[in-house]
Amino acid sequence: MNIREAKQQIKNAMIAYFTKDEFGNYLLPPERQRPVFLLGAPGIGKTAIMEQIAQELEVGFVSYSMTHHTRQSALGLPFIATKTYDGVEYQVSEYTMSEIIASVYEAMEATGRREGILFLDEINCVSETLTPAMLQFLQYKIFGRHAVPDGWIVVTAGNPPEYNRTAHDFDIATWDRLKRIEVEPDYDVWREFAVSAEVHPAVITYLDIERSHFYAVEATPDGASFVTARGWDDLSAMIKLYEAQGLTVDELLVEQYVQNGEIAKRFAMYYDLFTKYRSDYQIDRILDGSADAGLAERAAAAPFDERVAVMGLIVDATVSCLREAVMEEKAAAFGHSVLADLKERLAAEGVAENADASALIRATTTELARTRDTERAASLLSDERYRSFERIIGLLDEVLRTGADTPEGATFNLLRERFNERLDELDAAIDTAADALDNVFKFVEEAFGEGQEMLMLVTDLSVSRAGMAFINDHGCDRYFAHNQNLQFYERGHDLAARIDRITLEEE
């Protein structure tokens, strides 16, 4: 199966394992909750989907790479303890708590979440001295004498032997105690992630043209030659940083991530051509509706590779614009909930809205910062939620600073006034994003009509979480018209239904 199907299968298993009866007991007892074994080639996103599942289910998450562990760190250190059996004292061997099990308890204390996922990567690549202990762990969820706490589900991952010389197979008795999920690289599925995650458009459009270069592993006289999804994703992030700093992106950089000489060389050549298209086509002016009159004609007459690159640039700029608006909208919704809670607390303490509320505002700021840091340390903080925390904490800090210079102090009225100013800025940003979306459709209509380029635009907006969130909340007549024409209406409607709606209820 592909990585998206694997994620859904694992998520379904987690939901089932976490299900309790009316007395708070797990319907499937922990001893019968089979650990999941995710088997797949390196760099296809196994670890990433586990972090996503933990965030989506709002449970704890602890991750370990087992190749870094010795028998002592996994099992704990031995020590001599005194026990009494039938009135006779004996000295027996005991073990300190495993570092891995201890990390689970530490995560529970830090986050307050009693349920979670313990993810052990490269489980089939452990040293020979640790192998018996790992097999025991997979069967009984015990390291030494210490078990994984109830409510924590074990998920493991590993590479097939053809990708890792140190990987070894399990016997039938072990496999019969695991939920085995095999994952294969799939470019179409990865592309949906890439569009939504704003992977650099040069990477996406290059792979649209050279799909066989998405994932390749081969043996050469000089060693392994390979390129993986992780490599493309990491290269994308580095290209963005290089561009922001005005640094040169060349073959020397590319081959550090794309460890296949021929593919690295071809992508570096394509990137040079891509940057020329970016300069020529004035993408920002397409979004604001001020592009030169002849630009659409040039795009229509361009060869295939150029049209793919141009559409990649347009989609990337559009999704980035919509994502910015959606993230600010979610931050505003989060801020609204914080203000509503603060208002209730002020009323409960008898503090008027025009009275100094510095103490409570400061306490709220501290609580928010603590929650943010806790979620971040536990790998449970998404980019959207992080921005939401930063926006409201920044607003509260601003009000405290302003209030310190006024006789009235930091009042709730001042806080509401500043928040409403942010809402006005948000409305302007939403209008700008809506205009940009409309302008993009106008340009693609003029240049390509109902051709493959329009199909690419509609499809990529449909798989973009930010794109569908924005369209779902604010509409786009041209999107729905072309979506219906291209027989994607039902798919788009289904995707839209899965997006959390954002509503800002003003006082």
Predicted regions span which residues?
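Exposed alpha-helical structural elements
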Residues: 5, 9, 103, 189, ...
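Generic hydrophobic, helix-prone segments enriched in Leu/Val/Ile
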Residues: 10, 100-104, 242, 419, ...
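Alpha-helical lid/collar subdomain of P-loop NTPases
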Residues: 196-359
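AAA+ P-loop NTPase catalytic core and its hallmark functional loops
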Residues: 1-212, 217
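Amphipathic alpha-helical interaction segments
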Residues: 103, 198, 214, 240, ...
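Terminal-proximal interaction/regulatory segments of ATP-powered molecular machines
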Residues: 300-507
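Extended hydrophobic/Leu-rich segments
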Residues: 6, 97-105, 299, 364, ...
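General structural signal for secondary-structure boundaries
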Residues: 2, 6-9, 36, 171, ...
